[in-house]
Amino acid sequence: MNTLDFVDQSSLRDDIPAFGPGDTVNVHVKVIEGSKERIQVFKGVVIRRQGGGIRETFTVRKESYGVGVERTFPVHSPNIDHIDVVTRGDVRRAKLYYLRELRGKKAKIKEKR
């Protein structure tokens, strides 16, 4: 094991739940405003998960007041308090970029049984 792998191994988090594309998640993010710190929840559908190790990221998409909002998070970021999996989605793709063009009921993802 070389030095970079050792540093990566020590920075990995072990409290990350198993989730993938199509799952609806609540991401509790630490937000620092001045000297105050608070937790902000970002709820949406995971449209991709890519990378590996310390560089792994995932993108969450939600509709806010009719506008699509996407946010990309590093999985092992210290700014993420925790992640809750709300529902498991039944999808056949690893990247759900096609959801960007869909609106309303067409953008619904079937729930896994």
Curated annotation (Swiss-Prot):
It comes from the Bacteria. GO terms for cellular component: cytosolic large ribosomal subunit. Pfam families: Ribosomal_L19. Signal peptide: none annotated. InterPro entries: Ribosomal_bL19 (IPR001857), Ribosomal_bL19_CS (IPR018257), Ribosomal_bL19_sf (IPR038657), Translation_prot_SH3-like_sf (IPR008991). Gene3D superfamilies: 2.30.30.790. Coiled coil: none annotated. SUPFAM superfamilies: Translation proteins SH3-like domain. GO terms for molecular function: structural constituent of ribosome. GO terms for biological process: translation. Keywords: Ribonucleoprotein, Ribosomal protein. NCBIfam families: rplS_bact (TIGR01024). Belongs to the bacterial ribosomal protein bL19 family. This protein is located at the 30S-50S ribosomal subunit interface and may play a role in the structure and function of the aminoacyl-tRNA binding site. This is Large ribosomal subunit protein bL19. It comes from Mycobacterium sp. (strain KMS). The gene is rplS.
